Swiss-Prot record:
The modification N6-acetyllysine is found at K4, K160. InterPro entries: G-protein_beta_WD-40_rep, Histone-bd_RBBP4-like_N, WD40/YVTN_repeat-like_dom_sf, WD40_repeat_CS, WD40_repeat_dom_sf, WD40_rpt, WD_repeat_RBAP46/RBAP48/MSI1. This is Histone-binding protein RBBP4. There is a cross-link at K4 (Glycyl lysine isopeptide (Lys-Gly) (interchain with G-Cter in ubiquitin)). It is found in: Nucleus; Chromosome, Telomere. It comes from Pongo abelii (Sumatran orangutan). Gene3D superfamilies: YVTN repeat-like/Quinoprotein amine dehydrogenase. SMART domains: WD40. The modification Phosphoserine is found at S110, S355.
């Protein structure tokens, strides 16, 4: 009986999702300056823009690159580098180019040929997460379904993978007992990599100190303060010895690598009422960070007084799995997760007065809801070179590259012609 009910609920939910997506598609010309929808061969659990951009002479587009992965059903997995052509501001831009069938829009007409897979490298199992090293973006670390963290220099691998499926990482980092997701390169110390694991620990490696012939590197330090699965870890962006971690024990911990005590963090705070899945330090303000949780909220913190939560962002309907500050605006952050939505928030609008109609759509700090995905969003990344451009990937193989309409983040349109959900006002 329960099975029948579940099947009925699933069918109803699918109908609702499809209806919502139709409405979203109809409204994209008003909500976005750019939407590119691309179906990957396999879903990617990870997405990160590489820092480089090419601007070909005489062309009306620039070329950007992304690090992706695969999550296959028992077939060979790959670490993937893809290129994306984004239209320049002066590209022929016309809302009538919107292709309602494809859900693509933004000057370009069709996206075919605008997104290409450039490099595929054999990988052991799915790529839980892949992140490039800031000091040398050719070097990419990956989290696997095993306890190993792998490091690849993609310039040393052919762009077409060996058909044997053999995975040959340049380094294999040991120290964990289980898999995980969290991964963070130190932006101030080249080669210092942190990883979070289901085994309740955080490992630190220094790959700059690796002997030339050694392929296996043991963790330099293992941090053991959490009492449950560690979901995410992140270096502070300015202080080379500080990092934060979050876990299923509902805690946010701040660590200092100069401390001799690897089982006790400098600070530990009960951050949420459920598992904490992600964290992000603000790139402009050295004391500010955000955490995202299974309690459906994003919390804002000040390192100078962690006893007090600065703010709680509430609008998500389900678990939050990723939170990232904008690289271009210190008050802007985004969050995504199981509810298929990516929310963009603006701290500067906290506490603003709202009409009752506006309040129904969400709090004043909720700037935009990206409603283009019809499955859980696994990861997203702000483009470092094009403000307001985001790449998001979902569990149903869909990758979207999009940019909200300028009148939404530039307050020149006080009337607010369209509300953030895209239902029109």
């Amino acid at each position: 009986m329960a099975d029948k009910e579940a099947a009925f609920d699933d069918a109803v939910e699918e109908r609702v999702i499809n209806e919502e997506h139709k409405i979203w598609k109809k409204n994209t010309p008003f909500l976005y300056d750019l939407v590119m929808t691309h179906a990957l061969e396999w879903p990617s659990l990870t997405a990160q823009w590489l820092p480089d951009v090419t601007r070909p002479e005489g062309k009306d587009f620039s070329i950007h690159r992304l690090v992706l992965g695969t999550h296959t059903s028992d077939e060979q997995n790959h670490l993937v580098i893809a290129s994306v052509q984004l239209p320049n501001d002066d590209a022929q831009f016309d809302a009538s180019h919107y292709d309602s069938e494809k859900g693509e829009f933004g000057g370009f007409g069709s996206v075919s040929g605008k997104i290409e897979i450039e490099i595929k490298i054999n990988h052991e199992g799915e790529v839980n997460r892949a992140r490039y090293m800031p000091q040398n973006p050719c070097i990419i670390a990956t989290k696997t379904p095993s306890s190993d963290v792998l490091v690849f220099d993609y310039t040393k691998h052919p762009s077409k993978p060996d058909p044997s499926g053999e995975c040959n990482p340049d380094l294999r980092l040991r120290g964990h007992q289980k898999e995980g997701y969290g991964l963070s390169w130190n932006p101030n110390l080249s080669g210092h990599l942190l990883s979070a694991s289901d085994d309740h620990t955080i490992c630190l490696w220094d790959i700059s100190a690796v002997p030339k012939e050694g392929k296996v590197v043991d963790a330099k330090t293992i941090f053991t303060g959490h009492t449950a699965v560690v979901e995410d870890v992140s270096w502070h962006l300015l202080h080379e010895s500080l990092f934060g971690s979050v876990a299923d024990d509902q805690k946010l911990m701040i660590w200092d690598t100069r401390s001799n005590n690897t089982s006790k963090p400098s600070h530990s705070v009960d951050a949420h009422t459920a598992e904490v899945n992600c964290l992000s330090f603000n790139p402009y303000s050295e004391f500010i960070l955000a955490t995202g949780s299974a309690d459906k909220t994003v919390a804002l913190w000040d390192l100078r007084n962690l006893k007090l939560k600065l703010h709680s962002f509430e609008s998500h309907k389900d678990e939050i799995f990723q939170v990232q500050w904008s690289p271009h605006n210190e008050t802007i952050l985004a969050s995504s997760g199981t509810d298929r939505r990516l929310n963009v928030w603006d701290l500067s609008k906290i506490g603003e007065e709202q009409s009752p109609e506006d309040a129904e759509d969400g709090p004043p700090e909720l700037l935009f809801i990206h409603g283009g995905h019809t499955a859980k969003i696994s990861d997203f990344s702000w483009n470092p070179n094009e403000p307001w451009v985001i790449c998001s990937v979902s569990e149903d193989n869909i990758m979207q590259v999009w940019q909200m309409a300028e009148n939404i983040y530039n307050d020149e349109d006080p009337e607010g012609s369209v509300d953030p959900e895209g239902q029109g006002s």
